Amino acid sequence: MRKIDPLSLKPHWGKSILKLTSSITVILFSLISSLTAQELPTPDSLYVSTQCFIREGNSFQDVVEEGREADVSGPNVVFFRQPIAGSDAAENQFIRIVVWDNMEHWASNVVVTPSDTYDCDNNNRRFWTNRNLGSNRNAYNGTDVSLVTTRRCSVQRGYNISDVYRSLNDTQLAREANGHTSVMHVSHLLLGPSSDTEMRTSIIIRTIGESEVGLARDLDSSFQTDLGIGTPANAPAEFCNDPSLSRSYMVYS
């Protein structure tokens, strides 16, 4: 019987091991990618935000009353948000938020309702995917008016919206464990004007009170802690500004 030199098998072993290692690497990478994708839920809604301006001779209350009397069908909810601590907002300026399921829902039903009391910059609307954070879902609890804070940030280079979601979700769960009742969202800009930022890096962190008093109480609780200065070094977001405060009116639901 012919003897086989063990040394002649080594190259074949090396090739087999290399193939096995490559296969394992591909499988592990696929599993990690799959797990990461599963951690980011699909958007809960689509927010379409538009800057609007009250016409001379009208008040914001006139705008709200007209909005509530309008014959609207299609969107899930419409909010009018009046700046209280805004970002250089004009005296007659407010934001209209129209909530849809997704882009298809918007495209199937979108109608610009004419108004006698205000005008909107409809050519520069912004489209945001919106995800709920934590477990609180009690915004506007028994009321159609509440307070809302919004903080604009950019996704830090090297991170993605999944990283932002996980970080903010952990933050919100910790707040809820400490008794906070407000709802938190993260919105991700996909369409519309975005000044001085790279594409798809603009986000808004939004907190909505179960009522005006509810959000004020949660803010008081936050203000009593040792507030950090600037965006945390380990956060997946950067260039976060100080939050704005608005009074939000639900005009259609």
Stretch-by-stretch model annotation:
Residues 1-18:
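N-terminal secretory signal peptides that target proteins for export/translocation
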Residues 3, 11, 25-26, 162, ...:
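Low-complexity, intrinsically disordered regions enriched in charged/polar residues
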Residues 37-253:
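Short S/T/G/P-rich N-terminal loop/turn motif that feeds into the first structured element of a domain
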